[in-house]
């Protein structure tokens, strides 16, 4: 029997989910997607593969998943049905019928994440997708974030243990400023668990004069054997785009 491979691009508000990856008895993006797909296709064991295993509370506007079906469904019709059945905080933005060899995780070449800071105190209408921290010197962050670029061993900026290789390449890291917000934009070949949030946490400490630029550079060069401790809040982090 021929299988058809579907690639989905989706957005989600991660506030009410325990991350992307399926976990026993917990509400996750993957479990919701699989349940909805099983229901509308009348299949029993559709397995979804995700390109990025975002943490609890982390958002996405460009997550990519893929799965296989034993039959063909027109893309436009499929997308409308999925979005109708999914909760309002998960939405499919694109469906593509793709080659059977495609794997969204293993073939991803790079990813872009944004971390969003508000310049003003948050209110009930905007608190979910950004972070407000008073008394921060963003000029220091603008200088420090450049140190991230290039190839580094990020073992001091992760909670993930026993990896064979902690080296990652950051192609671009910078701040974009608007009237209301600061966006920390990081584009890398791949990321390890909590890496961006630990990096942002250290940048927050630099901006509050609790850490120095020199300490940051030495940690990136592994000249200090002290792990980053401040994990930036999950709600400020957004997976923006995945490149193939």
Curated annotation (Swiss-Prot):
One of its GO terms (biological process) is tRNA pseudouridine synthesis. Gene3D superfamilies: Pseudouridine synthase I, catalytic domain, C-terminal subdomain, Pseudouridine synthase I, catalytic domain, N-terminal subdomain. InterPro entries: PsdUridine_synth_cat_dom_sf, PsdUridine_synth_TruA, PsdUridine_synth_TruA_a/b_dom, PsdUridine_synth_TruA_C, TruA/RsuA/RluB/E/F_N. One of its GO terms (molecular function) is RNA binding. Its EC number is 5.4.99.12. The active site is at 55 (nucleophile). Keywords: Isomerase, tRNA processing. It comes from the Bacteria. It catalyses: uridine(38/39/40) in tRNA = pseudouridine(38/39/40) in tRNA. It is an enzyme of class 5 (isomerase). Signal peptide: none annotated. Pfam families: PseudoU_synth_1. Substrate binds at residue 113. HAMAP family: TruA (MF_00171). Formation of pseudouridine at positions 38, 39 and 40 in the anticodon stem and loop of transfer RNAs. This is tRNA pseudouridine synthase A.
């Amino acid at each position: 029997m021929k299988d058809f491979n579907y690639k989905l691009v989706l957005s989600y508000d991660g506030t009410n989910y325990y991350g992307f990856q399926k976990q026993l008895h917990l509400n996750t993006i993957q479990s919701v997607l699989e349940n909805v797909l099983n229901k509308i296709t009348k299949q029993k064991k559709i397995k979804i593969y995700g390109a990025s295993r975002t943490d609890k509370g982390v958002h996405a506007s460009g997550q990519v998943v893929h799965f296989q079906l034993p039959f063909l469904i027109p893309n436009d019709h499929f997308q409308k049905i999925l979005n109708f059945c999914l909760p309002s905080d998960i939405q499919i933005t694109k469906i593509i019928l793709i080659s059977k060899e495609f794997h969204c995780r293993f073939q991803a070449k790079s990813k872009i994440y944004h971390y969003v800071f508000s310049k003003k105190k948050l209110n009930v209408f905007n608190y979910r997708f950004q972070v407000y921290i008073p008394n921060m010197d963003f000029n220091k962050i603008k200088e420090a974030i450049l140190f991230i670029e290039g190839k580094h061993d990020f073992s001091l900026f992760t909670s993930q243990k026993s990896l064979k290789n902690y080296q990652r390449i950051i192609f671009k890291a910078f701040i974009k400023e608007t009237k209301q917000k600061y966006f920390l934009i990081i584009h890398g070949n791949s990321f390890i668990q909590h890496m961006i949030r630990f990096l942002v946490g250290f940048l927050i400490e630099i901006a509050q004069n609790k850490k120095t630029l020199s300490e940051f550079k030495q940690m990136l060069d592994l000249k200090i054997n002290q792990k980053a401790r401040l994990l930036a809040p999950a709600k400020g982090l957004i997976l923006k785009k995945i490149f193939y």
